[in-house]
A protein has these predicted regions:
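Core dinuclear metal-dependent hydrolase active-site scaffold
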Residues: 5, 17, 97-122, 160
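Accessory terminal helices/loops
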Residues: 152-166, 170-241, 245-248, 252, ...
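Catalytic cysteine-centered active loop of the rhodanese-like fold, especially the PTP/DSP P-loop
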Residues: 259, 275, 286-338
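Conserved beta-strand hairpin/beta-sheet module of binuclear metal-dependent hydrolase folds
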Residues: 1-49, 119-129, 135
Length: 353
């Protein structure tokens, strides 16, 4: 496994790069926008393809690099379901997994620092964002923070992990880089409490100033969605009601760009072909499966994903490869369900033997 911990000295933010093998896919956690060039140089040097970029919560102390990384690499952006950002490609709930080749993280919903905070567990380590720091914890006095919720997140979820679990936080202000669950239980001064009320009293009396970039960072981080307003993309963006009129038409090929776990959790539009977003590029080049299917006389291709970001990016790529008879479902399956569109359970994949 490839693992790198990177540090932004301005915001004291830790960013993490993970990959299963040299030359494989990579995932980045909590990127800072000013460091994007560095984040892109490192995977290039290691022969990695950035597949996913993840934020543990909506940050108040720096502007996220999620949007810029997506624009420059076409990676999938990931956040928790509770994050009130305009658009991300994939949203996770408690217990869901985010996966790339050779790496799997389990999402833990840990509200308290914010109401959209998540931690991510991977084998022997946990990425705690701003929920649990080294000898400290994330503040709870803004962004719908809740000290009692933070107490439950820490004591009922994080501190129940194996004692040797490595703790990799989203920030550090003293030069520490890693801890363990056992160390934090024993030595973190904010965790030497007997109740949620006692913890809430500590947090209420911290008297911390607001983060310097808060008034800029929070609005920016709520608006990281892909700009699908180019005339070409806008003309090929269909609302859910319009798409429903095409359902069942042999001339329209519905293509689901989501991952298998999303399909199993949320269902599919009936009659959809499954082609995960990460596999799209090879399939729209000359000789590719989707390119061949799109070339059939009278055929149109309708792309959809969870919220419309992956499908808009895919639409751009299809147009760039000369496939003009394509469109996408604006707002993705989320908009489809809200409009009352039919959903079915996908058939399980069968293995030939």
């Amino acid at each position: 496994m490839i693992f790198r911990q990177m540090f932004d000295s301005v915001s004291s933010t830790y960013t993490y790069l993970l990959a299963g093998r040299p030359g494989g896919e990579a995932l980045i956690i909590d990127p800072v926008i000013e460091k994007v060039d560095h984040y892109l140089r490192l995977p290039s040097e290691l022969g990695l393809t950035l597949a996913k970029a993840l934020d543990t919560h909506v940050h108040a102390d720096h502007i996220s690099g999620l949007g810029l990384l997506r624009d420059r690499t076409r990676c999938i952006t990931v956040m928790g379901r509770q994050a009130k950002v305009d658009v991300v490609s994939m949203r996770l709930g408690d217990g869901d997994r985010v996966e790339i080749e050779g790496v799997s993280l389990t999402a833990l919903y840990t509200p308290g620092h914010t109401d959209c905070s998540y931690c991510y567990v991977m084998d022997d380590r946990v990425f705690t964002g701003d929920t649990l720091l080294i000898r400290g914890t994330g503040r709870t006095d803004f962004q719908n923070g809740d000290a009692r919720a933070a107490y439950r997140s820490i004591f009922e979820k994080l501190l129940t992990l194996p004692p040797a679990t490595l703790v990799y936080p989203g920030h550090d202000y003293k030069g520490d880089t890693v801890s363990t669950i056992a160390e934090e239980k024993a030595f973190n001064p904010r965790l030497q409490v007997k109740s949620a009320d006692e913890y809430a009293e500590i947090m209420a009396n911290l008297k911390l100033p607001n983060p310097r970039q808060m008034d800029v960072a929070v609005p920016a981080n709520l608006a990281i969605g892909f700009n699908a307003e180019s005339p070409e993309i806008r003309a090929a963006s269909l609302g859910a009601r319009e798409v429903m009129q095409r359902l069942g038409s042999p001339q329209t090929l519905f293509v689901d760009l989501r991952e298998e776990s999303e399909r199993a959790r949320d269902g599919v539009i009936p009659g959809s072909l499954h082609l995960p977003y990460q596999q799209l590029r090879g399939n729209i080049k000359p000789g590719g499966l989707l390119a061949a299917m799109a070339a059939e006389p009278g055929r149109s291709v309708l792309l959809y994903c969870a919220f419309g970001e992956r499908s808009a990016l895919a639409l751009q790529d299809m147009f760039a490869n000369g496939i003009g008879n394509a469109c996408h479902l604006k707002g993705g399956l989320d908009a489809w369900v809200k409009a009352g569109g039919p959903i079915e359970t996908p058939r399980p994949r069968t293995t030939q033997g």
